[in-house]
């Protein structure tokens, strides 16, 4: 058990190394390593995750998955069930914590500063461009989650769907 936890601690700098060297490690490799770490977390936390409707995902090109947001595991759960590399747009303030930073960096996630409209517009443009190039993204249109929301969908933020609309890309609804 101690050796297993030491290995997991070693994964954090390893994830950082992989994310700093995208020229050496492909997007697919980094995504699979992210999924490997998610599997270890699932085992430790005794979490089971099931995905349904994957046959309905677009076969080619980029698309944006829009999901309700219930908690910290949501993006990881979607990535666990999604075979093709995808990325995520996340609140900058929450994206620099231990392990979260490494997960976001590995998938080249976008950090959105909620209170900075100019930066947010730039992120929307980046996501639009990358979706046009074939990347897949996870966006939580409610902008976050509240522990008190009682499993209700929060209101969507204005502009949440702009990147998919501007890219003329499929919008994939995801329910958690």
Question: What are the functions of these language-model segments?
Answer:
Residues 1-63, 77:
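Membrane-anchoring hydrophobic helices of lipid-metabolizing enzymes
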Residues 48-176:
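Soluble catalytic domains of membrane acyltransferases
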């Amino acid at each position: 058990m101690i050796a297993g936890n030491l290995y997991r601690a070693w994964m954090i700098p390893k994830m950082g190394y992989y994310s700093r060297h995208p020229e050496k490690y492909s997007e697919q490799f980094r995504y699979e390593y992210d999924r490997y770490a998610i599997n270890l977390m699932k085992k430790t936390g005794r979490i089971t995750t099931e995905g349904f409707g994957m046959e309905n995902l677009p076969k080619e090109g980029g698309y944006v998955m829009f999901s309700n947001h219930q908690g910290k595991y949501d993006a990881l759960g979607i990535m666990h069930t999604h075979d093709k590399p995808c990325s995520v747009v996340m609140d900058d303030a929450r994206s620099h914590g231990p392990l979260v930073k490494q997960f976001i960096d590995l998938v080249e996630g976008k950090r959105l500063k909620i209170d900075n409209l100019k930066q947010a517009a730039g992120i929307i443009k980046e996501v639009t461009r990358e979706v046009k190039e074939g990347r897949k993204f996870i966006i939580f249109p409610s902008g976050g989650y509240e522990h008190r929301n009682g499993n209700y969908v929060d209101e969507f933020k204005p502009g949440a769907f702009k990147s998919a609309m501007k890219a003329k890309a499929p919008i994939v609804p995801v329910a958690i």
